[in-house]
Amino acid sequence: GLLSVLGSVAQHVLPHVVPVIAEHL
């Protein structure tokens, strides 16, 4: 379903987004 698609997208995106956010904090 949609939630499982969003879950899979989050798993691929978060590892890239979190370090970028952390650098700005």
Swiss-Prot record:
GO CC annotations? extracellular region
Location comes to:
Secreted
Primary site of residence: secreted
Q: State whether keyword Transcription regulation applies.
A: no
User: According to the UniProt entry, which residues carry Leucine amide?
Assistant: 25
Signal peptide positions are none
Q: Which domain of life is it from?
A: Eukaryota
Please verify whether the record's keywords include Oxidoreductase. no
Q: Which UniProt keywords apply?
A: Amidation, Amphibian defense peptide, Antibiotic, Antimicrobial, Secreted
Listed under GO biological process in this entry are: defense response to bacterium
Q: In which tissues is it expressed?
A: Expressed by the skin parotoid and/or rostral glands.
Role description: Antibacterial peptide, that adopts an alpha helical conformation which can disrupt bacterial membranes. Each caerin displays a different antimicrobial specificity.
Query: According to its UniProt record, which protein family does this protein belong to?
Result: Belongs to the frog skin active peptide (FSAP) family. Caerin subfamily.
What does the entry's free-text domain comment contain?
A: Contains two amphipathic alpha helix regions separated by a region of less-defined helicity and greater flexibility.
State the protein's name.
Caerin-1.3
Query: What species was this sequence derived from?
Result: Ranoidea caerulea (Green tree frog)
